[in-house]
Amino acid sequence: MNKTVKIVLITGLAIIAICGVLAIVALFRPGIIRDIQTKPACKVADAFMSDIQNGDLGGAYTLVSDDIRQNAGNAGALPVYLGILKPIVSFDRGFSMINDDRSEVTVAYFVVFGDQTEAAILLSLIKNDEEWEIMDVSVIKN
């Protein structure tokens, strides 16, 4: 093979490879960026759900907003105040959404309770002084 033909083929393959990588990045970049932006809030939400499941109500109490703490009264009353009336056996995180100014995140969980009933729990978090806190909890029963 001629040296010029080899250079043209290698250059063509390199251009195709670069275009392929750019296409993959263009397709998946929005999801990757969103995952990076929501990760700290999702960690707080996951910790809250784990605390509720494991009965660490004091831990869960520290992750909610001042308004929720004030209305619930104390850590022991938190699940009832939020509408989580049965023990959680398992939960799986579903979707998460972040608002345009990146100060509010909503995280969905699919939950199985001790009596095998299922529900969705939506946690709304707000960024307060660089810390994420839970400002609202919605329990949607199936």
Where do the PLM segments sit?
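Detector for Asparagine
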Residues: N2, N54, N71-N74, N99, ...
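Short, low-complexity N-terminal intrinsically disordered segments enriched in polar/charged residues
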Residues: N2-S50, N54
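Exposed beta-sheet edge and beta->alpha loop/turn motif
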Residues: M97-N142
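Short solvent-exposed beta->alpha transition segments
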Residues: K43, A47-S50, L57-T106, V112-T117
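Preference for short coil/turn "hinge" residues that link or interrupt alpha-helices
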Residues: S50, D56-L57, L125, E130
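Poly-acidic low-complexity segments
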Residues: K6, Q37, K86, I134-M135
